[in-house]
């Protein structure tokens, strides 16, 4: 379970193997209320209509809102996709939906009290 002092969650998906020199953010959703323990199918849609009340998405590194699926360049090898759930001790991050995922991460520093990461892999030949 989550730490007792959890006030909200942030969910991220990051590909550290993208050929950008800095990886690729596929999804960031933040300000998920602490009483939420799952996201519904379709939660990563661009309009965010099935996200829990109060939750917000940032643009991914393709400049789009919503989850962007795995699509490594053909022949580039195996890419890791790190799905993380961050437990925060604040109900809301002091950011707006126009900031980058890096700024979100900076604002989570000092408020993250727990984290779980599941890493999947995908390769396109």
Model-found features: residue ranges?
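N-terminus-centered regions that define maturation/targeting leaders and the start
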Residues: 1-125
């Amino acid at each position: 379970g989550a730490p007792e002092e959890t006030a909200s969650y942030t969910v991220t998906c990051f590909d550290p193997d993208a050929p950008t020199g800095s990886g690729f953010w596929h999804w960031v959703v933040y300000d998920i209320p602490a009483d939420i323990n799952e996201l519904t199918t379709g939660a990563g849609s661009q309009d965010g209509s099935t996200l829990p009340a109060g939750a917000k998405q940032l643009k991914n590194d393709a400049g789009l809102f919503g989850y962007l699926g795995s699509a490594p360049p053909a022949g580039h090898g195996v890419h890791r996709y790190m799905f993380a759930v961050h437990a925060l001790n604040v109900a809301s991050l002091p950011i707006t939906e126009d900031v980058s995922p890096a700024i979100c991460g900076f604002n989570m520093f000092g408020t993250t009290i727990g984290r779980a990461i599941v890493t999947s892999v995908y390769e396109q030949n």
